Every structure is written in structure tokens, then in C-alpha cells.
């Protein structure tokens, strides 16, 4: 399977026009014979990419005082907890914020407030803040998230996830794609037998089909 994925990535690179920005690499998987109406069968995984994501991951944190200082030092954008209620009343602004960042963190004391006012915005996007205990440096969590991608099907048979960027080499991209493939198939009753199709592509390039071996 690794060779098939590598061949598809190579073809995607060859067929993708040059852009003035760094494109991401994406994988699209379509399932078959899986009852996604049952939440137990849905894919919801955080995959640590062995070669990283190839581009900076945007992280924000609801934090105040000392924890906010630590977060800023780690390159995390800090959101003042006092603005949570206002964001909850401005759904458009909250959605904009949810799109702006890849991951959210929050000091434990603020988790309840976030859940009360913002739950309906980040949760459907799989971006509910991760609680940070007062004794933990947020930099430790942020470092791990820099190489993490979310694989999430919800109730859809087709789902997409990023696994790298055009700036990465073939071996790095292949290793990342294989990490996702291995995790997804391990969660399916029949493994690759539950996958109808798999495609890889750059952000703006054509989708290249990966030959699936059951």
C-alpha cells in the first residue's frame, strides 16, 4: 500500500501547477459498508504525523495572567477569557475565529465558560479547546499539535484531512499519508475492505486515485 500511496503523491506533484503560495497535501477517503448513523462507527482520530505538517499550525488559547504569558512565549495567540461571553453572542465572529485557528487550548477554569457560550461553534468543527492544567506549560501541548492532524468522518462516508505540504519531500509525505491510512484502517471492522476509494491531491491540484489493496 505504501508504494501505491507514494506513486499517487508523485503523480499529484507532477500534475499540480506552480502556485504563489505553499499548498497543503490532502487525503480524501470514502468508506463503504459502514453504518455512520451509529456514532461508534465514526472516525474521530488525532494522528501524529511522523514528518510534521510541513507548515505552521495556528493555535489559540483562552488564558489570563501568568498562563497567558507562557502561551505568548510559546507562539500561541492568546484570547482574553473576558471576551468569551461576547463571542458567544456574536455567532459570525465566533465562526470566523474557529476558522482562523487549527487548535484551541484553554485554562481549566475557563473550560466551563467556553462550553456554555461557544460550544455550538467549535464542537461541530472538532475544535473544542483542550484543557491545560495550571502546572503544565502550554508549550508542551503546542509542540505536539504542530505535527498533529485531525481525521474526522462525522456521519459522512467521504472525509478529508491534510497530511503535509509541497515543501516536504516524497519520503516525508509518504510517511505521513501512511500514518493516516494505518490509523483509519485499524478502526474499521474489515480494514481496507471498508474503504471504497482514496485520493491524494495538493490544495488546488487534481485528485489522484490511490489503488486500494484490501
What label would you give each PLM region?
Residues 71, 200:
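Residue-level signature of catalytic and energy-coupling elements of molecular machines
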Residues 20-24, 187-199:
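Flexible, glycine/charged-enriched surface loops at secondary-structure junctions
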Residues 63, 162-165, 202-204, 212-214:
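Flexible glycine-/small-residue-rich
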Residues 50-54, 95-99, 151-154, 190-193, ...:
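Solvent-exposed alpha-helices and their adjacent loops that cap or buttress functional pockets
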Residues 7-15:
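Interdomain regulatory linker/hinge segments that flank or connect interaction modules
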Residues 15-69, 86-94:
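Translation machinery proteins
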Residues 1:
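OB-fold/S1-family RNA-binding modules
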Residues 82-187:
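Long, charge-patterned amphipathic alpha-helical coiled-coil/hairpin "stalk" segments used as oligomerization
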Amino acid at each position: 500500500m505504501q508504494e501505491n500511496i507514494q506513486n499517487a503523491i508523485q503523480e499529484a506533484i507532477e500534475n499540480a501547477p506552480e502556485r504563489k503560495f505553499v499548498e497543503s497535501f490532502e487525503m480524501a477517503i470514502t468508506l463503504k459498508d459502514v453504518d455512520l448513523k451509529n456514532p461508534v462507527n465514526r472516525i474521530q482520530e488525532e494522528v501524529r504525523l511522523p514528518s510534521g505538517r510541513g507548515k505552521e499550525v495556528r493555535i489559540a488559547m483562552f488564558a489570563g495572567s501568568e498562563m497567558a504569558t507562557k502561551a505568548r512565549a510559546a507562539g500561541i495567540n492568546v484570547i482574553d477569557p473576558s471576551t468569551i461571553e461576547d463571542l458567544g453572542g456574536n455567532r459570525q465572529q465566533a465562526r470566523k475565529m474557529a476558522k482562523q485557528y487549527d487548535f484551541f487550548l484553554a485554562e481549566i477554569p475557563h473550560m466551563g465558560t467556553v462550553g456554555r457560550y461557544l460550544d455550538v461553534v467549535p464542537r461541530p468543527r472538532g475544535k473544542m479547546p483542550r484543557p491545560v492544567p495550571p502546572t503544565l506549560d502550554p508549550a508542551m501541548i503546542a509542540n505536539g499539535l504542530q505535527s498533529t492532524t485531525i481525521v474526522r468522518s462525522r456521519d459522512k462516508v467521504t472525509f478529508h484531512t491534510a497530511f503535509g505540504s509541497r515543501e516536504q519531500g516524497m519520503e516525508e509525505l509518504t510517511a505521513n499519508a501512511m500514518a493516516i491510512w494505518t490509523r483509519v484502517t485499524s478502526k474499521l471492522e474489515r480494514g481496507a475492505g471498508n474503504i471504497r476509494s482514496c485520493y491524494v491531491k495538493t490544495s488546488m491540484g487534481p485528485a489522484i486515485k490511490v489503488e486500494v489493496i484490501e
